[in-house]
Amino acid sequence: MPKRTLQGVVVSDKTAKTVVVRVDRRFTHPIYKKTIRRSKNYHAHDENNEFKPGDMVWIEESKPISKLKRWVVIRGEHKKSA
């Protein structure tokens, strides 16, 4: 079974080797047919502390690393500075 992969934006990097990633999803309400946006935060392992808030990253499922971390950052794109 393949591992799940999600795409999101880093919202926090305050803990060592960990980033908090916000993943947005969209779906249509089954009765009202309105498009609804929902988001969820995931704690992901960032071994080299290379990602900062605003960076786009892809995270992948892994075995539990700590109490909250079950995802690992596999790749990312750094936010372009102005």
UniProtKB/Swiss-Prot annotation:
PANTHER family: 40S RIBOSOMAL PROTEIN S11 FAMILY MEMBER, SMALL RIBOSOMAL SUBUNIT PROTEIN US17M. SUPFAM superfamilies: Nucleic acid-binding proteins. It comes from the Bacteria. This is Small ribosomal subunit protein uS17. GO terms for molecular function: rRNA binding; structural constituent of ribosome. Coiled coil: none annotated. Part of the 30S ribosomal subunit. Keywords: Ribonucleoprotein, Ribosomal protein, RNA-binding, rRNA-binding. GO terms for biological process: translation. InterPro entries: NA-bd_OB-fold, Ribosomal_uS17, Ribosomal_uS17_bact/chlr, Ribosomal_uS17_CS. One of the primary rRNA binding proteins, it binds specifically to the 5'-end of 16S ribosomal RNA. GO terms for cellular component: cytosolic small ribosomal subunit. Belongs to the universal ribosomal protein uS17 family.
